[in-house]
Amino acid sequence: MMTKMMKTKSSPNANLFAALRAAFPADLDAIAVETENGLHYSWRDLDRASAMIANLLDGLKLEKGARVAVQVEKSVEAMLLYLATLRAGYVFLPLNTAYQSAEIEYFIGNAEPAVVVCTGRNAAWVRPIAEAAGTRHVFTLDDDRTGTLLDAAARCSDRHTVAIKKPDDLAAILYTSGTTGRSKGAMLTHRNLLSNAEVLKDYWGWTKGDVLIHALPIFHVHGLFVALHGALLNGSKILWFSKFDPKRIVAKLPEATVFMGVPTLYVRLLAESGLTREAVRNMRLFVAGSAPLLIETFNEWRERTG
């Protein structure tokens, strides 16, 4: 008598990085990120660099679900650290660069990260706080592509198998602004972040050929999740600005199709004489978020840009 063996259907990997990586274009040598200083990163660069940092994190023998707290200036390498943390299956915790010692002490004490990454200039006071809270690993990362994190990652392989995650596994923790008491950590799962990115990709009509101007900080939702995930999930080129420079951004508008910003950024762009209908001729989507946009600002923007 023969017994029919039933195959168990394996579940797909719910790791957000797996979805983002699957959206990379076929031509991995195409430019993925162009910085305001003329540096270019290909999609292959993003894949390899994130793999190296992920291998570094794995080599630390962290516990499952370990938190990686990051307070660094905006840079492509900081973005790669985020992707690497997802890729390796750990939990990313971005911290506002304006936070001082008392705030950092609270967040690190509350979140209990296994890894803390800070700027070189802040390491002297961040390291004692982290070590007192039980953090075993402290690295530095600066916006000139230097620091102990990149030094250590440079010795790691550029091949990495994406960690298997379930939809409801934690991907990131973002602390609230603390308007009703002490800041609280909002727990965001891989499912949360991917579903949000997919909905916005569809709603905003991301298409092949879209180019994003990324001028937002990456320590909060708008810059890290809404803008970045949208571009990566669409395989879109990113024009990267580490600092908001209205004149240089206006000069890049003809090369872009999508821009996301907070209302104050739109006010600053309106002060530039180069902001004309001709300058935005290729733009199809401007998004204002994170705070209310005054109707006066909206009307002036519409008048200037059409």
Predicted regions span which residues?
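Structural core segment of the AMP-binding/adenylate-forming
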Residues: 59-60, 64, 87-152, 160
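Conserved AMP-binding/adenylation subdomain of ANL enzymes
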Residues: 194-211, 219-258, 272-274
